[in-house]
C-alpha cells in the first residue's frame, strides 16, 4: 500500500511551480480529497477536475508569493476579481513638482491603448503645446499653466466602445463622472429630450394595436351575427315557398283524378259495341254447342269483360 501511495505524496509535496502536466495527470480523485482533508477542508469536491483545481489553489495559498505562477495564483485567489469598467478615467495627482514649478507628471502606461505624445493635448492644454520626453521614458512634461487652470485637475479618459478604443485628453473629473453616469443609464434620457425612447414608441404602438384588435373583433362578431340572422330569414322564406309548392302539387293532383275517371268510362263505352260484334261472330263460327247456351250466360259475358276492364283501369 505504501508503494502505491508514495508517488501521489511525492507529487503533492512538490511546489506548485515545479508541477508538470504529467504530474497532475497522475493524480487521482482520492489522492486530492485526502490531501485537501489533511489541510483542513471539510467537503472537498467529488469531481476529479474540481478536486485538482482545489489542490492547486490551496498550494498557491500556502506557498509564499513570488513572480512565478504560484504568486499569480495567490493574487487571483486572495484579491477580489475586478471587472474592468467600460469607461475608465485616469486622473493626475498633484506632486511636489507641481507646487514648485507648475509641472504635471503623467505615470507611464505600458498598455496598447495609451498614446504617448498625443497632439490633442495641445488643444486642451491652453499652453504652447510643447512636450519633452525624457530618456528613461517614465515621465512626460507639459508646459506650465496658469494658477486658475492648475487649480482644477484635468486627466485623460479612455473609452472602450464596440471594439474600438477612444482616448481623450484634458477631461475634468466632473465631466468624466457625467459621462460615466450617462453610459451606465443609456435608456434614461433628459425630460426635454429631442427624441423619444424606443421603449415609449413601442409602448404607444402596442397600445394602438391593442385598441384596434378589440374593434376588429367586435366588427367580425357583428358581421357574423348579421349573416346568421340573414341566413335564418332566408331559410324560413325557402321553407315557406317549399310548403306552398307542395300544397299546389297536391291540389293539382286532386283536380286531375276526376278527368282520368271520365276518360276511362268513355273508352269503355266506345269499346262495348265492338266487343258485342266480336262476340256475335264467335257464336256464328262455333255452331250448336254455343247456341245451346242460355241467355243468362250470354248476358254474363259482357259483365265479365266490364269487370276486367275496370280492374285494368
From Swiss-Prot:
Region span, Disordered: 118-149, 220-256, 281-313
Effect of a null allele: Plants lacking both TIFY4A and TIFY4B have larger leaves and cotyledon laminae, a dome-shaped leaf curvature and shortened siliques.
Primary location class: nucleus
Residue interval(s) of motif Nuclear localization signal: 234-241
Domain Tify: 150-185
Annotated Basic residues bias: 243-256
Entry's Gene Ontology BP terms: leaf development; regulation of cell population proliferation
GO cellular component: nucleus
Motif Jas: chain residues: 232-254
Keyword terms, alphabetized: Developmental protein, Nucleus
Annotated function: Regulates the arrest of dispersed meristematic cells during lamina development.
The name this protein goes by in its record: Protein TIFY 4A
Organism: Arabidopsis thaliana
